[in-house]
């Protein structure tokens, strides 16, 4: 859907968002830039916020999604699988709710 009103999936672990669109974007940015700081700059967020999100993701999954080393960071094979799975889930959800979303959007004040 190209409309600005949309539904975004979030995978919860208790009260914690284990994974969602922001964390997917952060992993992709780390993959592109090779570092958490580079990803944070690209996403216009603080390094501290990016680091906390990485720590949270690494705690929520049975294996780390991001590995750090002197001079940078990289995403793991598990992270690539998680991002791909999340994107498939989001695409299926968008498709499943498309008709109802269009109807709901027609009722929302200030629609685009």
Predicted regions and their residues:
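Residues within the DNA-recognition helix of helix-turn-helix
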Residues: 53
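Alpha-helical linker/hinge and terminal dimerization helices associated
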Residues: 86-104
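Short helix-boundary/capping micro-motifs
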Residues: 30-38
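Central "turn" residue of the DNA-binding helix-turn-helix
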Residues: 44-46
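Alpha-helical residues within the helix-turn-helix
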Residues: 41
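Short, Lys/Arg-enriched N-terminal segment that forms or immediately precedes the first helix
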Residues: 2-15
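A short LG(V/I)-centered, amphipathic sequence patch enriched
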Residues: 59-74
């Amino acid at each position: 859907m190209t409309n600005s009103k949309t539904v975004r999936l979030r995978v919860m672990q208790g009260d914690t968002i284990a994974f969602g669109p922001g964390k997917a974007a952060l992993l992709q940015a780390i993959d592109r830039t090779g570092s958490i700081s580079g990803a944070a700059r690209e996403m216009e967020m603080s390094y501290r916020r990016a680091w906390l999100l990485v720590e949270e993701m690494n705690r929520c999954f049975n294996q780390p999604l991001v590995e750090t080393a002197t001079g940078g960071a990289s995403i793991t094979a598990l992270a690539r699988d998680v991002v791909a799975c999340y994107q498939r889930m989001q695409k299926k959800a968008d498709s499943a709710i498309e008709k109802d979303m269009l109807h709901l959007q027609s009722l929302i004040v200030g629609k685009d």
